[in-house]
């Protein structure tokens, strides 16, 4: 039995252990579900109290049933969809609740049976049950803030698959209801037992109380939504523009009394009709009207530059919805999202409610039918046009013409206003979004400009029901409004579109923009008003409006073309009579004569209009008025002005009114708040609930006292957030402001979690113990949390009462002033005297002067309550009730002595004075200990005493660092030794050097320092085993180096092992001595043990270890240096004996010499038969042996038998750095190494990781420069792609030189066409082959024809000159011929490598690294191909001796070579350079004659055809001589680097920023200043050098461009070239169809109007317009229900038999027919869709380039 129980209890216990938390979790949340006390709970409690417990049980049973249905809805979706649809339950239940409400309000009768109802069929019991059920279902909707309900539902949905959670939750929920029932029964029993009132009267009171409670609770569900009560609308005009100036009640009453306005009967009928048909409006408008009064939420300002007042916005105007149009989804303005959701639900479930049809008609049927009809119509029209063309009609009559709008006089609209044009063809109108833009409405325009109520109250206007402004419309009718547009209609684009009124400045001659209006005092200027017709406030407004018009500078900069000139005085420019007064107010007597009825239209409205007009219109206006005498000007005002207005506006082109969406009903110029610098009479019109301003400040400027608003908001919760009075309150949570300065506010629910500060880990000082006291931290954290959790403690409440007590601020201010005077006059002088008297008693020099000077610096500034500084004497306004502060600037600090030099320590430069005379850092803050007079007095004294004690006792200062145990210290020692003792360690190595040398380092991981010797021995033995393989040149070098250094490694390993043992014994010996000392003198030195131990670990040991490490490093370097003797002997023996392997390792030996040619490491000494090599190179070779896997080289049995044709074996045998430059440049030209110079030498202090170079010049200056270069390369790629895309239509069968796009090359020497090579060392065929190989992938073409006008051999020879090995220039004629034969041999041997498909594939790719300097990209491969070919046949040692002889000559010729590369010669030459040039000229003259002879011999042998290339030059900038040489060096060095940034990082200390700017100028000017000249060295037939001034008059940089970027001038030119192809039928007859403006005329096809021959290559779709053509093709591609009706395929039209039969030139131009098929005009039009030309962007970052289908779909 026990075993059975054990078997049963085991799984049960495990299940309980796993499911226990879930069960407890479910019970908790189930019980939590009963806590929301909603209407159902209230109704159940009412039932318990009104009747017997049976009523309450029935009601609570209904509530439980409703909640059970909610639980079941999580598992059964139809129940959830039925219950929780938006407003579905509400629409069904609200009528039921409406009738139940009257039943609840009935008084309970005393005759009701107190007995329990036994049947559920009882109507009373059924109503109770249904009420509880419905109220429970409505609970989530009716509850105002259902946090608990949402929380429970969230967890129920989350854990609904867990049956344990659901069962436990249901149990907890039932338990909660049971407890609730028991509690309510107990309360009901206590009320019945202890009540002293009659039972009937008690039930009546309970019924009335709970009925009101339920009613109020049901009304709370509305939240902050507007109440559904009707309110009166604001008195505003119908067009939505309210009068800006508000009137008080008295003025409004008088205006109504005096107004006699006849109501327009027509408008009255419209209003009645609108009210009559309100109920017949469609569904959304019937319930949701965006023009209702209380719809707007808050204000939004007009612009960021002005504060003219906000603009009311409507929520419903900023929502969009989708609808079907042309089979696609379009967006349009729509209603709120909730309205859309409700409409969809109503349409889906209640179609009868919306009177919608329930037919099963397909919604797309009508659209399909429309599309079919349009397609058939287009097909029929196209067919008729083709038939007319085939019957012989002229093409000009058949081709469709574009329709233009025109008026009755025949004047057509301009392209800007043509509605048929769109996109880039239609002009753009710059419009500044301002509330005062010119509108289409007369009344709205009037309110924008004048915004006043101006009329004659006695006469009135008969047709003005609005009460103002109709006189403009009346006068407009007199001016024949049908002939010309109104002033408020759209103006031309060059007209200023907005006016920003600002007030005048103090100086009337210089208008200045301001952002607020000065407050105008009615009492001061009331005597100026003498006109009884218009009320004084309106005159003031007129004066302000007519004072000045100004545009802020920020606005003018946004639209430079429009706002070129600021607006000045309106009347000052329009009429010179009116001048503002000095006070800035225009006198009314100066302008009263202008504001008569007949001139009101002219001066009040058109002055603003003509102020916006263009310059020439103003010129006409001023000229016309300048000749009129001043006395006759007023009599002629109306007639001349109207005629001038007619003359100007009638000449403007016709325009179409732009569609605008106005903000309805609301005005745009209302006041913001109480302090807006406006007249106090207008304050009653404030319609925005702004935050309460606490106080203001006043300043005395001169003799005037000006009040300025200082926004100080109270620290209490304020919900007045710029809301419109009477509008919807935003649905937001309540917030609590409990801090003095609280930038972020949170809900009360998340307040505690958000505001608890998180202290950092290093907040506590752990320098002494190295450990943190957890108890201390816990105590401090608990204290902080307690402060946060209890913000309303007794102390906080007391402080709050003190701060809010008005009388307290008065007494506090008096105390502050008293403390300030006591501090300045008593305390500080007393302390200064006492301190200096003490110094005198101590026989020290007194410091009275310095102390008095510091005390005078202290300033006491009176501040407002929030700390805003005012002045030293002026008190803030309302300081008696709102408080004040006294701020101490440069507070005085008493010091024991002053330093001779001022200390630049960071200290607090200000503080606030408290009522006790102390200092604090914040207003109303507590005094702090680190602020005060004595804060700087005791600290220096203690510091000096401490230093004296430490000096006398021998104790030194202990660094404040963390404690380090022994294990960590040993690890640091080992890591330090590893990094210092590793030969050529990684700390001195750089990845950049590894990349340049072509190898990767291999890291040796040594776990223990004792294993270092063993590891090195294993490596040496493995290398020795490898060297036992067949000996080659490289393996012999490696083996000899290892043999020579083997002994040094052994000695080094043993020495290191001994030193490590000694180092490890040092801590143990020291601690043993310490223990012995502690045993003898324990009590005397207990205080110093811990400090001495730390000092030993931190100071003594590291210094000793550094000393040992430095010695070890020196010993290691000495060992490496001693081993170099054997290495030099080895190299000398190898190079002399091994002559047979020179051919195999030719690439390596050549590379070896190319390296040392620049750095000059090798030198031949005459007294010794050996080499002398640099130490850096030896270290490099030794370290290379460690990093080299030589076994892979010797895998092949006989590597010396490999030929260059066996390139696969070469690639398999050799590492990357072993390949010859010739082979590697063909395999991967991007990563080949061009040259290695002295800058590759590793120095310890120079090789710092790039990430650590924070303060370097490269990180701050060069990085933006490289980014610009990358963008330029990216731009080049896009240009190249676009040009390749365009040139795909070029004729491939025409290979004439004139077909190469580009500007025509004009030679600098027209008479000298045949220019030969300078030296004649290369055969022309060989050079042409090189050019063809190197220039693949570019736009350069090698043509077979006569000689080109520009010879490229000079550039090839001059560029190759600096990179080839040195050759004796005096023996060129003999040596070079021999070398040429060797080159031809090498050329034949390299055929197998060069012609392989993989190599050809790599050659065809573009070398993107050379885009930085395009002039070098065309010659880099030539350099690699020819460098190893110009090696003499003698030994290498002989070449070295010869190289030293000609070294001096090479330096002299460097200047000429650099000028040949770039194309410039300098006129400034010294004597040495001139001598060198004369000598070179003679040699070149002789070489030129030899070249002529060679050319003649070649021509006699039959080689008369020469392949020449075409170079193109451009002038980019003028450069000095010195900077030019530096630029040439940069070009040469950076051309061979993988990353140009490597050179910039190496030369960051010597970088020339102006030179880098010049490089940027080269790239920026790549599309400008293009000229074509011959190369720099142009010579005549006689071979003489021409004069520099004749060839090059200006010292300009001429850059060679092998990539033909010059054909693309800019983006707009390329776009014009693309579009010009599609516009081929310009005149439709008698002209060429397509003419390429750049490539020359190529016949595409021709339509002759007289003849009747038509080329079949013409695309017949060109008959239609492009827009209709695209529409026709799109409609044909639609598969409308598989119904190919009409012209669904265009092939039938193309195969018109009659038309094709009349074509007599069908097979004339087959190529053109194919091209017309592949590139029809509608395909070329798609090119415009490329984003970088359509959107006018220069890079591809905005959006991806569209993929264009290059071939049309083929229809089978």
From Swiss-Prot:
- Compositionally biased region (Acidic residues): 1484-1499
Q: Where in the cell is it found?
A: Plastid, Chloroplast inner membrane
Keyword Transport listed? The answer is yes
Q: Which keywords belong to this entry?
A: Chloroplast, Membrane, Plastid, Plastid inner membrane, Protein transport, Transmembrane, Transmembrane helix, Transport
Record's InterPro entries?
Answer: TIC214
Q: Name one GO cellular component term.
A: chloroplast inner membrane
Known PANTHER family for this protein?
PROTEIN TIC 214, PROTEIN TIC 214-RELATED
* Entry protein name: Protein TIC 214
Gene from which this protein is expressed: TIC214
